[in-house]
A protein has these predicted regions:
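HDAC/HDAC-like amidohydrolase catalytic core signature
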Residues: 1-159, 164-309
Length: 309
């Protein structure tokens, strides 16, 4: 089984304000972890910059250009309370989306079995025409649309286990029966969306919120009783994971208590669905995860599971 690891140094050049949790050290710790000899068989590549027409599969062109125009020559530009741009942010965002596109290309053509893209900024809070929650372009949504438009995938599934609900992904696919979006997340918590009652126009949105203090048992129950049955019924041609690791016990931004075995378990379960429905095709894209030790450990077991099944 071949797993591709995609990253790029440009991801380090998106510089947030001092003390911001979504910081370059996140990619540095992932790089250090994946340099270990146990990952020597990983295929590796660098994320290209996504062309505007690929990003425009999910975002209006005038929005893309507005983000480009907002890019500062020096210093920081704040777009909302949580989301700022430095001079390197726009290229990093293009390559974050481009890494997602590359992952789809490599998986859909059968060059690799699956792929993990570790880039920043993340994407799942970005709505069609709104940056939000550290996010500019919705990488998972772009990946799904690219698989459909370029490779003829009839159905794509995005499974999001970040502790924050992916309001942007839900927004983009709310009225699209060809994409299923499934999410576990703490509720109530930022951004305030993700209730069970939010189902989409075609019942293609599956929200399974968790409560503060929940851990692996509740997480696995949400998948076993809600998400996995819906995924199997949907029979996706591609499984895309919005891989946020901020539901880890150590994470400072939330109150869910997952540990490394929980991330192994969910990765294997999603690979089983992909094996049953999608010829094993899995694309995993980094979202959140803000405790560096918890992030490094979680990514290590997630990628190990992708490599070994």
């Amino acid at each position: 089984m071949t797993t591709l690891y995609i990253t790029h140094p440009a991801g380090l050049q998106h510089i947030p304000p001092a003390g911001h949790p979504e910081r370059p050290d996140r990619l540095r710790v992932i790089e250090r972890v994946l340099e270990h000899e146990s990952f020597s068989t990983l295929a590796r590549d660098q994320a290209p910059a996504a062309p505007f027409h690929r990003i425009a599969l999910c975002h209006p062109m005038d929005y893309i250009e507005a983000i480009q125009d907002a890019s500062p020559v020096e210093g920081l530009v704040r777009l909302d309370a949580d989301t700022s741009m430095s001079p390197g942010t726009f290229e990093a965002a293009l390559r974050s989306a481009g890494g997602a596109v590359m992952a789809v290309d490599e998986v859909m053509t059968g060059k690799v079995n699956n792929a993990f893209c570790a880039m920043r900024p993340p994407g799942h809070h970005a709505e069609k025409a709104s940056p939000m929650g550290f996010c500019f372009f919705n990488n998972a949504a772009i990946a799904a649309r690219h698989a459909q438009n370029h490779y003829g995938a009839e159905r794509a599934a995005i499974i999001d286990f970040d502790v924050h609900h992916g309001n942007g992904t839900q927004d983009i696919f709310w009225a699209d029966p060809t994409v299923m979006y499934c999410s576990t997340h703490e509720m109530p918590l930022y951004p305030g969306t993700g209730a069970v009652s939010e189902r989409g126009e075609h019942n293609n949105i599956v929200n399974a919120p968790l409560r503060a203090g929940d851990g692996g048992d509740e997480f696995e129950q949400a998948f076993e009783t809600v998400i996995l049955p819906r995924l199997r019924d949907f029979r996706p041609d591609l499984v895309i994971i919005s891989a946020g690791f901020d539901a880890h016990l150590r994470d400072p931004l939330a109150n869910i208590n997952l540990l490394e075995p929980d991330y192994i378990w969910v990765t294997r379960k999603l690979m089983e669905v992909a094996d049953q429905c999608a010829n094993g095709r899995v694309v995993s894209l980094l979202e959140g995860g803000y405790d560096l030790q918890g992030l490094g450990r979680s990514v290590a077991v997630h990628v190990t599971a992708l490599m070994r099944g």
